[in-house]
A protein has these predicted regions:
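Transmembrane alpha-helices
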Residues: 231-267
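Glycine/proline-centered hinge or cleavage motifs at structural transition points of membrane proteins
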Residues: 168, 227-228, 241
Length: 334
């Protein structure tokens, strides 16, 4: 029997009779000799449009819905205005102060170059993620895939991770100063700051990776086992590729926290305005550079310019991560 594809609209009631949503199914197969089963899309008008008077009449009957409507829109407006004001303020203050001097290769008291701090930020971020990334991901794999159900250790680890996530960064800075800088003899250095930041972002990476792994359907694992794959192959060939977007989200969250961190690095990495050439060199990142310029009060304009560069850097990181996650998801779908 020949078949043809036609579009249909299925109307689903939601709430009372006046409030309905329209769900569009783009494809529908139907027998060639049964035209009555085909619904013409163009002949059906949208029925979920209501006038303001109709909405107001409903709100008068249900004042709670009206209050919720006001609160939701008010919260959205406050959020958008706050973020917009912050962005506009930073751009207005910083963009006019962007010039060739602050992009000089070496820092001096005259040009207040941010290039050494920018390069040090890249070093600090990569080194911290290189330490915390594998540990957090493999810890999450153990908790989700290998730990027994009801294991008390899993509960302890999760509670500890959630607690560490809420600890102020200054506490991590003091710990890093006492342990890595003093006890381990690493002094104020790039490696001290990276190790401290790795401990700080480890719970974020571990928890987001754990949630991403738990979101993978059990049918994927069962199908892999049914085809004869072992536990290790299933984890690395089936589960992890499916959880890549969620894992990337955790890494991006960690990256944003590393790039914007100040208090932790003042106590562990120092504030030397030079490009680090060794792991034991004292150095400063963009956030620390901006803080010190603002604190001194002599180069506030350069501090705003640094804030613009830092803002652009974070936006680019998030944009790149979204593109990578989208590409991975598209490749997986294909």
């Amino acid at each position: 029997m020949a078949e043809r594809v036609e579009g249909i609209k299925t109307v689903v009631a939601c709430g009372d009779d006046r409030t309905k949503n329209t769900i569009i199914s783009t494809k529908k197969t139907a027998p060639e000799d049964d035209p009555s089963s085909i619904v013409d899309v163009d002949s059906i008008e949208a029925i979920n449009k209501r006038t303001w008077s109709e909405k107001w009449a409903e709100y008068r009957k249900k004042p709670g819905s009206f209050i919720m409507f006001i609160l939701v829109h008010l919260a959205t407006l406050i959020t958008v205005l706050s973020i917009g004001f912050l962005l506009v303020y930073v751009l207005v203050k910083g963009v006019p102060n962007l010039n060739a001097d602050i992009f000089s290769w070496e820092y001096t008291s005259d040009n207040c170059s941010l290039v050494p701090a920018l390069i040090n930020t890249v070093y600090m971020t990569l080194l911290s993620l290189l330490i915390a990334g594998p540990i957090g991901i493999f810890a999450a794999i153990y908790l989700v895939e290998y730990a027994k159900t009801g294991n008390k250790l899993v509960g302890v680890v999760r509670i500890t991770a959630e607690t560490l996530t809420g600890i102020p960064s200054i506490v991590y800075g003091l710990f890093g100063m006492l342990f890595f800088t003093n006890a381990c003899g690493l002094r104020l250095s790039l490696i001290s700051g990276a190790l401290t930041l790795a401990i700080m972002v480890l719970p974020v990476i571990m928890r987001t990776t754990e949630e991403a792994l738990m979101a993978v359907p059990k049918s994927y694992r069962e199908g892999s086992f049914g085809l004869g794959a072992g536990k290790l192959r299933t984890v690395f060939k089936v589960v992890l590729p499916s959880a890549v977007p969620g894992i990337l989200s955790g890494i991006i969250l960690a990256t944003g926290r590393i790039v914007g961190e100040t208090a932790t690095l003042i106590y562990t990495a120092g504030s030397v305005a030079k490009m680090a050439t060794k792991l034991t060199d004292s150095t400063r990142t963009l956030a620390v550079h901006m803080y010190l310029l603002s604190k001194e009060g002599l180069h506030t304009d350069q501090g705003y310019a640094t804030a613009v560069v830092l803002l652009v850097l974070v936006v680019l990181i998030n944009f790149a991560s979204d593109k990578i996650a989208g590409k991975v998801a598209a490749d997986k779908a294909n």
